[in-house]
Amino acid sequence: MSSVAKSTANKLDWTKIVSKLGLSGQTAAALTSFKKRNDEAKRILFELKQQPSNVDFAFYKSTLKNTAIVDKIQSDVSKFTPSKANLSKQLNLIESFEAKALENAKETESVVLAELTDLEKTLENIESARPFDQLTVDDVVKARPDVEEKVQDMVSKGRFEVPGYKEKFGDLVIM
């Protein structure tokens, strides 16, 4: 990891990411899971760095009768070189996570923008609407042409009562 990436990773404030970006659902859960794994890896690395790595072979040679085995272990330790781990699989997982997170973020952005546009139109309609008591039948028919069709259909069939009206508002007939 480059020094710039390490510096950025250390400065990253995980608590603000979800709230500032407005993430929710699967994206927020995946980010939280990634943060937990990152914190656990940092903790384990810190603990391992704190452990002493030097072995006092002179102490073991003076304590044990079989110094040949201590010499063998000492030579094996001096020859030991840590193996390089293949991180390509983990890096590919991180890249796929980033790609999926970016895709989810773009989807969320498009949904939010569409919703905002609809809400702005609705607000504009509400602000420009006339008061209810100033509406005419022609205004209602212009806004909802299906209302005129329903009324004409009911009149042609001889129905002059709106279905469900009595159940909802009661019957005002006294006799």
From Swiss-Prot:
For molecular function, the Gene Ontology terms on record are: proton transmembrane transporter activity
The record ties this protein, via InterPro entries, to: ATP_synth_F0_dsu_mt (IPR008689), ATP_synth_F0_dsu_sf_mt (IPR036228)
Q: Where in the cell is it found?
A: Mitochondrion inner membrane
Keywords recorded for this protein, A-Z: Acetylation, ATP synthesis, CF(0), Hydrogen ion transport, Ion transport, Membrane, Mitochondrion, Mitochondrion inner membrane, Transport
**Modification sites for N-acetylserine:** S2
Q: Which GO terms describe its cellular component?
A: mitochondrial inner membrane; proton-transporting ATP synthase complex
Q: Which domain of life is it from?
A: Eukaryota
Q: How does it sit in the membrane?
A: Peripheral membrane protein
Can you cite a GO biological process for this protein?
Answer: proton motive force-driven ATP synthesis
Q: How does it assemble?
A: F-type ATP synthases have 2 components, the catalytic core F(1) and the membrane-embedded component F(0), linked together by a central stalk and a peripheral stalk. The central stalk, also called rotor shaft, is often seen as part of F(1). The peripheral stalk is seen as part of F(0). F(0) contains the membrane channel next to the rotor. F-type ATP synthases form dimers but each monomer functions independently in ATP generation.
Q: What does this protein do?
A: Mitochondrial membrane ATP synthase (F(1)F(0) ATP synthase or Complex V) produces ATP from ADP in the presence of a proton gradient across the membrane which is generated by electron transport complexes of the respiratory chain. F-type ATP synthases consist of two structural domains, F(1) - containing the extramembraneous catalytic core, and F(0) - containing the membrane proton channel, linked together by a central stalk and a peripheral stalk.
Describe the family membership recorded for this protein in Swiss-Prot or TrEMBL. Answer: Belongs to the ATPase d subunit family.
The UniProt entry, under PANTHER family, shows: ATP SYNTHASE SUBUNIT D, MITOCHONDRIAL (PTHR12700)
Protein name as catalogued: ATP synthase subunit d, mitochondrial
Look up and give the organism this protein is from.
Answer: Pichia angusta (Yeast)
